[in-house]
């Protein structure tokens, strides 16, 4: 039986009611064609449950947006979608090409502010998000009574005489599902040990994000990034209206787990009777950053599972928690969004 729209239907009966499966679920290849987004290749994926999301082949297989039954879930920053050729490694230019989106991948050489390590300049939140996917593939087919949709690709963060790190990503969903899964593997294809930093910038926006939206985050330790003091729970859990001329808050969490070692965090809008949750193994991402931006025009909330806090690779905190790859050492079954 196929589970669809809260009910069940025989596969044969479903096929009797449609001409092609793309009538209810599929992956449409698209190419953006205006402004700084011109040339971005992407797939628009929809699975019949009302869940839709856009995966950008030209930008790390990151997600430009996600919607559920027509309701936007994600944040789109002021620059909008920006093609990789506008990427600028220098200084404070990050805000000129940061699209936000449902997922913006940060790393692999740096997360946090820009810095210089020996002869290498590292930009704010790293290069990987601006890296086009290679060896890409889309697969949409029946497996018994399940219609499965997936997209995959490889992103190479590499330089002559320097690192060769490869992020292998697969994003998958199925007909009728209210979720998708991101499975990432990072490989060191070079011949020397490399530091690795990884953060998933998962960005929520209006109308899911609105006054009185709740953040559900089981945490053992929470600190305010500005002064490293223990934060009032209400401060990071409660969403307000946008405030003109205000500033954002950033909180550092050590999330709690269930008996299986998984962490689950969520954002819930009771007025819309709608929420989104992330579930992942804490051993893969021991830290969580919450970016709460109640600023008018930049109104967003990001939940950011990460390998260490985003204080750039040269900070003492990052050095203390740095992970290294000698070969294929780091794998992750990432969040269900």
Locate each region found by the language model:
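Beta-strand-rich N-terminal accessory domains
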Residues: 1-92, 261-284, 332
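An extended acidic
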Residues: 1-23, 85-156
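Acidic, contiguous internal or C-terminal segments within carbohydrate-active enzymes
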Residues: 45-59, 68, 155-202
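Short edge-strand/loop segments of extracellular domains
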Residues: 73, 202-209
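Active-site/ligand-binding surface loops and adjacent short beta/alpha elements
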Residues: 110-113, 206, 210-282
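Beta-strand-rich interaction surfaces with strong enrichment in secreted/lumenal proteins
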Residues: 169-172, 320-324
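Short, structured beta-strand/loop micro-motifs enriched in basic residues and often containing a Trp
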Residues: 310-317
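Conserved small/polar residues in nucleotide/adenosyl-binding loops
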Residues: 330-337
């Amino acid at each position: 039986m196929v589970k669809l729209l809260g009910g069940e239907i025989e596969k044969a009966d479903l096929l009797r009611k449609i001409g092609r499966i793309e009538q209810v679920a599929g992956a449409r290849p698209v190419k953006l064609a205006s402004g700084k987004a011109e040339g971005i290749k992407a797939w628009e994926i929809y699975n019949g449950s009302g869940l839709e999301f856009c995966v950008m082949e030209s930008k790390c297989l990151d997600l430009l947006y996600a919607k559920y039954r027509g309701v936007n879930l994600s944040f789109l920053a002021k620059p909008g979608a920006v093609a990789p050729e506008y990427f600028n490694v220098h200084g404070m230019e990050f805000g000129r090409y940061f699209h936000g989106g449902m997922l913006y991948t940060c790393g692999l050489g740096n997360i946090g502010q820009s810095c210089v390590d020996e002869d290498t300049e590292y930009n704010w939140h790293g290069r990987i998000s601006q890296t086009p996917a290679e060896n890409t593939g889309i697969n949409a087919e029946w497996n018994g009574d399940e219609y499965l949709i997936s997209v995959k690709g490889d992103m190479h963060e590499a330089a002559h005489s320097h690192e060769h790190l490869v992020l292998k990503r697969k994003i998958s969903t199925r007909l009728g599902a209210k979720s998708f899964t991101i499975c990432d593997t990072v490989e060191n294809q070079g011949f020397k040990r490399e530091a690795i930093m990884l953060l998933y910038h998962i960005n929520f926006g209006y109308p899911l994000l609105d006054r009185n939206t709740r953040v559900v985050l089981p945490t053992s330790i929470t600190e305010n990034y500005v002064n490293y003091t223990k934060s009032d729970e209400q401060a990071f859990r409660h969403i307000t209206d946008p405030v003109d001329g205000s500033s954002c808050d950033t909180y550092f969490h050590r999330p709690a787990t269930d008996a299986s070692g998984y962490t689950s965090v969520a954002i819930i809008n009771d007025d819309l009777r709608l929420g989104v949750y992330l579930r992942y193994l804490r051993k893969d991402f021991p830290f969580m950053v919450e970016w709460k931006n109640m600023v008018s025009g930049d109104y967003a909330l990001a939940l950011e599972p990460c390998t260490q806090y985003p204080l750039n690779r040269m900070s003492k905190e990052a050095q203390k928690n740095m992970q290294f790859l000698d070969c294929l050492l780091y794998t992750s079954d990432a969040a269900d969004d």
